[in-house]
UniProtKB/Swiss-Prot annotation:
It comes from Bacillus cereus (strain ATCC 10987 / NRS 248). This is 2-succinyl-5-enolpyruvyl-6-hydroxy-3-cyclohexene-1-carboxylate synthase. Its cofactor is Mg(2+); Mn(2+); thiamine diphosphate. InterPro entries: DHS-like_NAD/FAD-binding_dom, MenaQ_synth_MenD, MenD_middle, THDP-binding, Thiamin_PyroP_enz_TPP-bd_dom, TPP_enzyme_TPP-bd. The keyword Metal-binding applies. The lineage of its organism: Bacteria, Bacillati, Bacillota, Bacilli, Bacillales. PANTHER family: 2-SUCCINYL-5-ENOLPYRUVYL-6-HYDROXY-3-CYCLOHEXENE-1-CARBOXYLATE SYNTHASE, PROTEIN PHYLLO, CHLOROPLASTIC.
Length: 584
């Protein structure tokens, strides 16, 4: 037998088998020649689920979506050259949103590098600081030590991806021709296992008892506190955060991505309209928390970030299992390296029930006043983009997922996704906040989260049209709501809007595309709605039938801006009147 083929088959077979043994059982593959042996072995292994995606950029985000939804590592495989470079945006997003991806790139062997060989470029540390770890795998050799090395390296890389903060890792595989493995080899998947096998087990960072006692003592004398829950908080944070709020009397300012706004838990202390009422000047000047406890990533709301930044006299406690200083407001006074659950559990156990005071009632009262005013937009007949969110939530069934694209959809979700007793998971790509790869990420998530509704703007939709292929290839179920304002709607809310002379050409960027033909090309259904009743009917139909469903609602950017400003102005008047009444 050819010694090269034997080495190739056993070495890469050990690698693939070790992936599945460590529960990395999903791989998104883009076709290519140099990655042939790994792709074939993955397809052959009974423990591996393989998903084809032709476009590497979309493939990267598709894998990201699967990993976000499954909350475990997913592998990506491509050939050498620019194919690997197309993963870059998804890798950046995975790194900053702390999602474990196992990025596998095939490469030319060392003798074909820097000599002008076709489809060869420098892939060493290709993703730079956006991966937690990089390793250049050894050329396959036919001996037990190398098979064991393949497994041990796999263990180390997966452990790195799972270690807090979670994130992507990159393995580069130089491979010589011929590239076809021999599946007739005996014990193809067993080489390198040895008598003992490694286990990658992720634990929780715990709270030192001395710190807990000290913190409990301090908090017991602080009546005015806030609990802020952002993206990527622990999946059980709702239960623990609400218990902590009940003990302390601190309101919970819940970002929509914290998934605390919806569900069957007690939401008495949950504040959902802070993005609107924290714009009020009088409120910002008079409401001064003594302590702010923050879990997860920084919230979407700019108004909340600015409010946090102004609280220079407060104690700011950032709870982060990795100990990283995610503090763009630059106000953190304490960073606690513990899991959200460990932190809450420790305080709940030792914290006495605080005396009821006016602090939490003030927040609850203003929150309800604000929500009452915001709900007036549900009477608007016009195509107001904020109502897109409330009407979707109205028809979503229990256990559904709402995926919000970046730019305006996530901001409208922040403003208009009110508390609900239905379990509705909210997802988004808030690592680097780009508008690329949104369709693909949502489609990846839809493999696990069904039904799933994606809300996306027309430019973001255009940006990832190639991603729709996954819906056709893998027969996925998804409803995509395209809010078509023919351009970049968010720029109307920014200072650039005042530069009328060049606004449309540089920022408004209308592209005037009809997406119906594209959707049909990918085997999906398309409907352009003309009223809110039809909108709700089409969204509901999409969540109860199989396949790709695209619902387009056309809006006017200038009108949408005016309606947002009108609502904000009205809420500010209501809030100011309420605050002035309380001060009398």
């Amino acid at each position: 037998m050819n010694n090269h083929i034997e080495a190739l088959s056993y070495y890469l077979g050990a690698f693939v088998d070790e992936l599945t043994r460590l529960n990395v059982c999903d791989v998104v593959i883009s076709p290519g020649s140099r990655s042939t042996p790994i792709a074939l072995l993955m397809e052959q292994h009974e423990g591996m689920n393989t998903y084809l995606h032709v476009d590497e950029r979309s493939a990267g985000f598709f894998a990201l979506g699967i990993a976000k939804a499954k909350k475990r590592p997913v592998a990506l495989l491509c050939t050498s050259g620019t194919a690997a470079a197309n993963y870059y945006p998804a890798v950046c997003e995975a790194f900053h949103s702390r999602v474990p991806l196992i990025v596998l790139t095939a490469d030319r062997p060392h003798e074909l590098r820097d000599v002008g060989a076709p489809q060869a470029m420098n892939q060493i540390n290709l993703y730079g600081t956006f991966v937690k770890q990089f390793t250049e795998m050894a050329i396959p050799e036919a001996n037990e030590a190398m098979y064991h090395y393949a497994r041990m390296t796999t263990q180390r890389m997966i452990a790195s991806a799972l270690l807090a903060p979670q994130g992507p890792v990159h393995l580069n595989f130089p491979v010589r021709e011929p590239l076809i493995p021999d599946f007739s080899l005996e014990s193809l998947w067993d080489k390198g296992r040895g008598e003992y096998t490694g286990v990658v087990q992720r634990g929780n960072a715990v709270m030192p008892s001395e710190y807990v006692d000290s913190l409990v003592g301090r908090l017991s004398h602080m009546e005015k506190g806030l609990i802020i829950c952002g993206d990527d908080s622990h999946s059980e944070i709702a239960t623990f955060a609400t218990q902590l709020a009940e003990k302390t009397g601190y309101p919970i300012l819940a970002d929509p991505l914290s998934n605390i706004r919806s569900g069957h838990h007690d939401k008495t202390m949950v504040i959902d309209c802070y993005d609107t009422f924290l714009r009020n000047v009088l409120l910002k000047e008079t409401w001064k928390p003594e302590v702010i406890i923050r879990f997860g990533g920084m919230p979407v709301s700019k108004a909340l970030t600015q409010f946090i930044k102004k609280q220079t006299k407060a104690v700011h406690i950032v709870v982060d299992e990795s100990g990283q200083w995610r503090d763009p407001a630059l106000v953190a006074t304490e960073v606690v390296q513990a899991s959200d659950i460990a932190f809450c559990s420790a305080l709940i156990e030792k914290m006495p029930v605080m005396k009821k005071n006016d602090w939490s009632q003030m927040w609850q009262h203003i929150n309800e006043k604000t929500k009452e005013t915001l709900r007036e937009m549900e009477t608007y007949d016009t195509a107001f983009e904020g109502r897109v969110i409330t009407d979707i939530v109205r028809v979503l069934p229990e256990g559904a997922t709402l995926f919000a694209s970046n730019s305006m959809p996530i901001r409208d979700t922040d403003s208009f996704f009110f508390t609900s007793d239905k379990n509705i998971q909210v997802m988004a790509n808030r690592g680097v906040n780009g508008i690329d790869g949104i369709i693909s990420t949502a489609l990846g998530a839809s493999m696990i989260c069904d039904p799933l509704v994606l809300v996306i703007g027309d430019l973001s939709f255009y940006h990832d049209l190639n991603g729709l292929l996954a819906a056709k290839l893998h027969e996925l179920n998804i409803t995509i709501v395209v809010v078509n304002n023919d351009g970049g709607g968010i720029f109307s809310f920014l200072p650039q809007y005042e530069k009328k002379e060049h606004f449309e050409s540089l920022f408004g960027t209308p592209i005037g595309l009809d997406y119906e033909h594209v959707v049909n090309m990918y085997g999906g259904s398309f409907s352009r709605v003309n009223g809110w009743e039809q909108f709700r009917e089409e969204v509901q139909k999409g969540t109860t039938t199989e396949g790709l469903h695209v619902v387009e609602i056309c809006t006017n950017r200038d009108e949408n801006l005016t309606l947002h400003r009108t609502l904000w102005a009205k809420t500010q008047d209501v809030i100011t009147t309420s605050l002035q009444g309380e001060s009398k």
